[in-house]
Amino acid sequence: ENVLEEQPEMMTEIFREVDNPRLRMCLDVGHVNAYSPVPVEEWVSACAGFLSHFHIHNNDGSQDTHCAPGEGTISMAALLRQAQTLCPEATFTLEVLQAAPAVSWMLEERILEG
């Protein structure tokens, strides 16, 4: 899992070096938004070949606040579509402080359908 890494290459280099299909990456999109100057969408594109799991939460980009997906600066619906396209087998953990707003957002955006 990425925590304070500023560039996706900091993670992809490790996975390329180890070169083992059993070692997969968890992308914490809130950490990317708070700690990296690289947009989350670029991280997904750069790391797609190694990604198997995502931690989903949002923030305003200044700190890791674990807000609901619809409450922050990440365009979460677009990001989840990108993740489903590039990493169709990936799983997701909703990592928020309050579940109700997150579930409401997922229902409104029809994230759980399909």
Predicted feature locations:
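Conserved glycine-rich "GG(E/T)P / GGGxP" loop and the immediately following alpha-helix
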Residues: 5
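Histidine-acidic metal/acid-base catalytic patches
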Residues: 8-27, 33-114
